[in-house]
Amino acid sequence: FHKAKVNGDRSVEVWGNGTPLREFLYVDDLARACMELLLNYDDSAAINIGSGQEISIKNLALLISEVVNFRGEIIFNTEHPNGTPRKLLDNGRISKIGWIPQVNLADGIALTYDWFLAHYKNGGTP
């Protein structure tokens, strides 16, 4: 989306039809979860760390487009696969010890894009 915006492209292509659901977690939330587990979890059972929120690829593309300020068209290319219909972790164990993510998806994307702009001035070249 950034490259398309900078290049003045009229559209961005996204593979599939946009219906698959995905879960995302901001990196600082992952770091906080790891610290919480190091300090407060001594069980041997595996534990998932996730946001517990899912979003369709279509809505994710719209959100990224908004954050990047890309005003072109998003084209969903159904000649390419959708992938797995749904990916959402069970956060039950980590929730029981009181951890919850602090950064929502929209804020996480905005923070990540701001970081990208600060570190990659030439659209991907450090």
Where are these regions (language model features)?
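C-terminal substrate-binding subdomain of Rossmann-fold SDR/epimerase-dehydratase oxidoreductases
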Residues: 1-126
